[in-house]
């Protein structure tokens, strides 16, 4: 008797649903993407109990013909590709023909649809993938799909759903990403009768950003644009003063498809250079137009992982586009806004792991046919508070002498659990180290020094108003650029070690390091195999101080494992940051007038005078307008979304 059998269609669809439909947000994503592929300009999503009770997606797309509706529930039935060559030129969001049958197999499924050419609409009802009703009906052109009792026949999946608030947050995240990817589509998301998100569908990306993040955020987004023979990059990135604690506010789009790509995330951060604080991430919406032949989206059923040809060239293009746009901006933070943020008390809430789930403050004025921002009134009185903390000198600890003939290097364990990709870099490595890229000099205001406060802050005035300068951050930037140039040129001459070092690695890391050993050797680091899972180092480049060898070699190997490259410049940049921090003046240190003026002059000559190497602001600016607002001499005006489109 044959042991191998062909699985029934329903069971096969339920197995496929395990990959395609992970949670209610997966259903929303697949249905909305189908609506976009159908040419819809208006899409309404209505959910109950975070989608577990019901999900309804209504669009005004082209609809489905009566005879095609049952086929939509058959696995691998699709209208989007017809031959093998189409796989290499995919221009639609969906193409696998798995989503609808997978959804229908784990829910009570109802679809109403009509085409412009059809004499009537179609109603189809299915339960657990089995069609129960397929009849003509009267309905407008477009499609309405309703999913009820999701996972009713797969209780194991239902058991592991998170709280309704968490599942709702995932749905909002999906709609926000799709709204940014397709600003030409008007999206409306309604949860339990309450409107969560509404976008105008005007095609203006900045207006879509305002509809999701708010007007204040949209005003601080800088437009970017760049292209070459293969790629066209456009979108918006936030000014360095506007950051978040995680990468969840970075949206990368390829041909209108939201994707997750760690290397492109890194390219965005590289474009900021040292303008971002360590551990902080920008808001960004990067839209990449690419020949479909260069992007393989047939990697995973969710289609969020994309393999890109010429990825390094694309990374360089993105970084350059961001760096160029930021260079043209005034990067001195507005002091009044920073002051308001630090002194107006708000209820604390836990850090979110997705795009913010909150009630939109935009309201619609029917008379003016436009959106406006509801004003927020801060009742807390503003006050100046000293918030800077002194930077302490680091202390050097001398290691005890070794009695053995070789030194066994010790390292701190590196956790790969938090990495988005096991081969790629993480924030702790990528943020503080990429500082040796030459930055164009920006226009710096002419400042007239007139005083110091608490031995910490310098006061100066210029055409732009009052400037307050953090003297430690200012000198740190000056000294960093000095040390950067001083140690930037690398000599690969070798020096023998009297006592070799032994480095231990896990077996999988050993294999990957051996595969890429040439990159280490190009950097002047020659490791030899020495026993099981061990390398021995008998000589070192002369630019490596001996006290740096232990930590430095491990750091170079980590860089190799995570980023598939070894950059001496990045490693040396870390050293320049450390030296500049240690040797700069600290808080509570009074400067005479000559020293203060000289420091401001040296700062004005820096490539990037606005941030210290760690990304903290060097100076803030109170404009005349800011002062008048503080003393209630003028009132702020509210900006409409229509006016925002003029930016």
UniProtKB/Swiss-Prot annotation:
Keyword Mitochondrion included in the entry's annotation: no
Function according to Swiss-Prot or TrEMBL: This protein is involved in the repair of mismatches in DNA. It is required for dam-dependent methyl-directed DNA mismatch repair. May act as a 'molecular matchmaker', a protein that promotes the formation of a stable complex between two or more DNA-binding proteins in an ATP-dependent manner without itself being part of a final effector complex.
GO molecular function, one term: ATP hydrolysis activity
Species: Streptococcus sanguinis (strain SK36)
SMART domains in UniProt: DNA_mis_repair, MutL_C
Protein name, UniProt field: DNA mismatch repair protein MutL
Composition skew (Basic and acidic residues), residue ranges: 387-400
GO cellular component: mismatch repair complex
